[in-house]
Amino acid sequence: MSEKTVRTLTGKVVSDKMDKSIVVLIERRVQHPLYGKSIRRSTKLHAHDENNVAKIGDVVTIKESRPISKTKAWTLVEVVEAAAE
């Protein structure tokens, strides 16, 4: 069987109040269809954090996984950069 490519994204943790869960803000740049100006668009994704290692402000990498709950279908891979305290 062929290896399936796994979607990974990098973003900033905006909430870690839930147990074993984090909310990650993913920002991307798109061009306006008519005027061509570069615009920031953002998406908030819920991710599974098994060991509660990520804190607010951390830059993290998440990967797509099977649905874990109603809103969670992403899993924490690593903390790329810890937040300055």
Swiss-Prot record:
Keywords: Ribonucleoprotein, Ribosomal protein, RNA-binding, rRNA-binding
Keyword rRNA-binding assigned: yes
InterPro entries: NA-bd_OB-fold, Ribosomal_uS17, Ribosomal_uS17_bact/chlr, Ribosomal_uS17_CS
GO molecular function, one term: rRNA binding
Keyword Heme appears in the UniProt entry: no
GO biological process: translation
Pfam families for the chain: Ribosomal_S17
Any one GO cellular component localisation term in the record: cytosolic small ribosomal subunit
Quaternary structure, from the entry: Part of the 30S ribosomal subunit.
PANTHER family: 40S RIBOSOMAL PROTEIN S11 FAMILY MEMBER, SMALL RIBOSOMAL SUBUNIT PROTEIN US17M
Family: Belongs to the universal ribosomal protein uS17 family.
General function of this protein: One of the primary rRNA binding proteins, it binds specifically to the 5'-end of 16S ribosomal RNA.
NCBIfam families listed in its UniProt record: PRK05610.1, uS17_bact
Protein name according to UniProt: Small ribosomal subunit protein uS17
Organism: Acinetobacter baumannii (strain AB0057)
